[in-house]
């Protein structure tokens, strides 16, 4: 069932999203060689609580961390450990803020620099995903369909990358994961995919591999 939010609920989610955006920006800018995944997790939790939110992922039964962290060949949903990140690592952080009964969900990925060297293949990989993601987000509007979003993300396949089809974006609100599912590939004809309506709230996620 797809939940349509009220204007007040939208304002609450917007505030939670602003907190999450600020937290994730600080976290990603703070990641450096030698930090452990658990230290990154602790930083995210501290910042969320300082801003008046709660770690949304900790409300998932059985999950005890603020973030999921995915390094290099981990796709998504990696659990923070004592592993230290190093130069050249691709580090993805997925995080959620819970505020006044509503969830938000956001992820960001960075490439830890190799000093004076560059890694053009990884930089190209990350740019392709970010460009496709923003093109997809621009399609989230009343009257469009989920397929309009999915096909934009699937465009990374034209660059030789592959979409992970077992993991998808989703609605978000009172629950962290709500309908509709938003795959990064065209799972059905666009006209048969769910219709976006005003005051729907979704998490658009591009999940893809280099190979």
Where are these regions (language model features)?
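Active-site neighborhoods and metal-handling regions in enzymes and metal-associated proteins
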Residues: 1-211
